[in-house]
Amino acid sequence: NFKLYKGAEKVFYNINSIIGYKECVITEGEMDVLALHEAGIKNAISVPNGATLNSNNLDYLDNCIDYFEDKEKIILAVDNDEPGQALQQELIRRLGAEVCFLATFEECKDANDYLIKYGKEALAQRIIKSRPVPLENVTTFKDIEDEITDFVKNGFKRGYQIGIPNFDNI
């Protein structure tokens, strides 16, 4: 039975569970926290009121910021929808990209859906295999792996012809 009382200070659901851990998981709903508990991940918390596109009101983060000072890794496991992605970007901005990691749930909406479809071991692996926030303006091998493979197999693509045989054959 989850309730929000009018005028009450908003805090993360299950916030005390991250005390003493160097990492934590932030979800978008209480049921996602319970799904992670089922998968053996106890240091999971949830934003108190989900994510909305119209509001970036993260007062609850300001109220709880001290809980994150000692965290070396913060895994963001938000919903795979537009409001969830907006929440993710705002959390990255406020908490710092250097400590944030991203968990994805393939075609599933969230951690709870993933648990129902694939089971608790698969959900735990999704969290364990979370990836760092991609750096802006940095290209990694994974980003261009397909292009490199094509080049190795096929070489340079033929350039434009200008109509002068000595140049066209280069």
List the model feature ranges, each with a label:
Residues 136-170:
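The Walker A/P-loop phosphate-binding site
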Residues 29, 80-81:
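Short beta->alpha junction loops/turns
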Residues 1-70, 88:
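Phosphate-handling DNA/RNA-contact segment within nucleic-acid enzymes
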Residues 17-26, 86-146:
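Short, small/acidic-rich helices and loops at N termini and domain boundaries
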Residues 43, 73, 99:
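Residues at the starts of beta-strands that form the adenosine-phosphate
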Residues 69-72, 145-146:
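Short acidic (Asp/Glu) and glycine-rich catalytic loops that position anionic groups and cofactors
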Residues 47-53, 80, 104-107:
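Short, acidic/turn-prone active-site loops that include or flank metal/cofactor-
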